[in-house]
Amino acid sequence: MRRTIPGARALVSAALAATLFISAAPATPAAAADPSEASQVIAIARAQRGDPWRYGATGPSAFDCSGLVIYSYKMAGDLSLIGNGNYRSASALYKYFRDRGRTSRTAATPGDLVVWGNGRHIGIYLGGGMAISTLTSGVRIHAVNAVTAPFTAYLRTGVYQLPKAPVVPAPVPSGSVVVSR
């Protein structure tokens, strides 16, 4: 048996419109403006693109590979995550992390470190198979497999990643009528 409720169509239409409006609303500005530590480290490293390579340089106008890593973490306030700057070479950073934080290619996250040549070269993992490091041509973004030295390891630094936002269903407006047969 079918019953007609006066005004039900208008109410259902209004509820649907409200649901669509609420679910299409952008994320709150506070959440969008709160970058993770990893994105801060990466943004600082990216800002150095094009700076020249110089052996032993730690910035801000020239870098070697470990100098870029140390500078990026230091400027982001995360130097404690990579040994407080006490490890000044790629091989020293590799030795520091070798037994503390190795991770796999599939589990590596942006902000982790990438090591090539058993510690002869180091960079920052950007995600998607890409890294940023200081090559002899300067600070560059490149594929992890583009470095001529053989890949050695991904190293987990513990840099904070923003969690993915959970999917929350839109609330049903109060006073809604659910009509069932």
Regions found by a protein language model. Name each.
Residues 34-49, 53:
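Extracytoplasmic low-complexity, Pro/Thr/Ser/Ala/Gly-rich segments
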Residues 2-12, 26-27, 31-33, 86, ...:
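Aromatic- and glycine-rich peptidoglycan recognition patches
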Residues 51-110, 151:
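Catalytic cysteine-centered active-site loop
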Residues 42, 49, 73-76, 115, ...:
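Generic helix-packing signal
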Residues 13, 43-46, 70-74, 133:
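Generic alpha-helical structural context detector
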Residues 111-118:
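Short beta-strand segments that buttress and anchor functional surface loops
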Residues 13-23:
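Bacterial N-terminal signal peptides
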